[in-house]
């Protein structure tokens, strides 16, 4: 029986380890089988640009519109991401190639020309969806071996000049060559879509006479199967001129199975960098672990052993270091209520982050589940309110406070209130740009309802449960008169030690942070939650150990004001995170619009502030455990 349990445990650990390397992919929707001739409806999504970070509705530009535009019901995460999924004029028949289809003919007025030129200037990309697969442009890149990568969406157009002229003109991609890859089931003869690619072209279409019911183009004719040539005259964006939008579609059988169809989108060519990041972080952890072990095993246990013999050896006068402040180390810190609020909020963020990563590792938050990650984070934040209330109330009672209701109110409203205020200002700026990224009033109202209707009551429930629990007893008594803190050496003064303490936690995550920022601001998929989960565990250990080490040095300097110092020591890593985001902005992004820059730094302030609360709470709890551990092992009259 013992052998069976040991084998099962080994298998479980092996499963968890390998699952952390690359997260499982569980499809967001059930597979759909298509027969030959079945209609396929292409949906359009937002227009996006890495140069502005301001998404727009697809029909913001004067594209072909269906008779009635139908909006697909987006989930909360999709709305927050700025997705606007709608129907389109692009329709296919399964397994039937269509060499040339006319979408529509539009006349370009002054406003349309201005919008097209603006979107081309900022390199906007149009996004489409077929059977829950985003359209992509195939790219070949050489990195030792030939590899295929996808670029999400296609460019609205490009700038260029005619031969013999230096004047820059604007050209629009008005002809789309789609390629649909499918995998055929040999038994049922049905097919499943496993790929959706597009090659955009700019073509100045010509025709003799326009027939709305059956337009015949001399440059692209479905009857003669004319093909678009690479040397075709491009379609210029000119006010008062017309643009004919066309498309063709070809179907190609693929060996890729439906369950693996997202692999090309999620292809990662930089696993070695992630492994380097993890090894680098583990070296930091081993270094800190060695220091903590040395403190705990060689110094503390020896000191405690010697200190416990002071009664018989009559050496009480020789007390030095951390032992001298035993009567003050559990003294209630200044602004203890605010500390309780921040620690409780940190527990809430920690719970949300941990559960979100577990769901992501199991594949429930894959990119095919569009908006699922954002939705999960919002909902988990709401329901983790009960742990925030419980933690802040328990800590407040340990500090011998008697205003638990006020602490509960601050826990429920302070942190989310600050975030909501920043978010509201940013949303107002987005509204001013007429971007689809602006959160509609209905969604804003839903967020407020989640906050006031679920999160706040749960915070109060958790706080009530924590208040009813008996107070955590201090292992030693606190003196009535505070001990004077001696003058500290320069390297132990709060400002210096706090800033030093944040370097190592940031160093443990900064490489992974690069990929996260690239995913957020350069519209790339991030699906390496296995690596991220390992880095998150390393971050927890690093925050805990660096705070313990610096706390011990602080106590040895007879400075017993450790509570806020512990929180700020690990929390200061958020300062380095924000400074890195500034560096990333100026070196990796090409944002030129003022509003876009404000949005970037506004969101990075939110992320850095959340990181501060998370890491600060980890450091505080680690220090609390450490201090209680060492002082509970000492005999004190």
Curated annotation (Swiss-Prot):
It is a multi-pass membrane protein. Its main location: membrane. Residues 1-23 form the signal peptide. The chain crosses the membrane at residues 275-295, 345-365, 371-391, 412-432, 445-465, 496-516, 528-548, 566-586, 594-614. It is found in: Endosome membrane; Golgi apparatus membrane. It comes from the Eukaryota. Residues 24-274, 366-370, 433-444, 517-527, 587-593 are lumenal. A motif (Endoplasmic reticulum export signal) lies at residues 626-631. Residues 296-344, 392-411, 466-495, 549-565, 615-637 are cytoplasmic. Keywords: Endosome, Golgi apparatus, Membrane, Signal, Transmembrane, Transmembrane helix. A motif (Golgi retention signal) lies at residues 635-637. PANTHER family: TRANSMEMBRANE 9 SUPERFAMILY MEMBER 2, TRANSMEMBRANE 9 SUPERFAMILY PROTEIN. This is Transmembrane 9 superfamily member 6. It comes from Arabidopsis thaliana (Mouse-ear cress).
